[in-house]
């Protein structure tokens, strides 16, 4: 695909410099990041990252789930409801 269009955005200069430094450490430029991000958005029809910040309860629940803490396994919904007593 030919790169023949330009994208411009106004951002804080300090933010731009900080991001450019981080990306340079990864071997990328800001243009590379924009190209990668827009390609993923076009292909997946969604943002390639989550804009929401989980609260502490959600973070702890995810950690517990990944560790297998308080995880209930069931063959179907009725079995799960029976195990949970509902």
Swiss-Prot record:
Result, substituting residue 49 to A: No effect in vivo, in vitro forms a complex with toxin YafQ which is not able to cleave RNA, i.e. does not release YafQ. YafQ-DinJ complex binds DNA
Effect of residue 8 to A: Does not bind to dinJ promoter
Keyword terms, alphabetized: DNA-binding, Repressor, Toxin-antitoxin system, Transcription, Transcription regulation
Domain of life per record: Bacteria
BP GO terms, sorted: DNA-templated transcription; regulation of DNA-templated transcription; single-species biofilm formation
Pfam families given in the database record: RelB (PF04221)
Role: Antitoxin component of a type II toxin-antitoxin (TA) system. A labile antitoxin that counteracts the effect of cognate toxin YafQ. The YafQ-DinJ heterotetramer binds the consensus sequence 5'-TTTGAGCTACA-3' in the dinJ promoter; DinJ also binds DNA but not as well as the YafQ-DinJ complex. Binding to the dinJ represses expression of the promoter.
Family: Belongs to the RelB/DinJ antitoxin family.
Subunit composition and interactions: Probably a dimer in solution, forms a heterotetramer with antitoxin DinJ, with 2 YafQ-DinJ dimers associated via the N-terminus of the DinJ antitoxins (YafQ-(DinJ)2-YafQ).
Record's protein name: Antitoxin DinJ
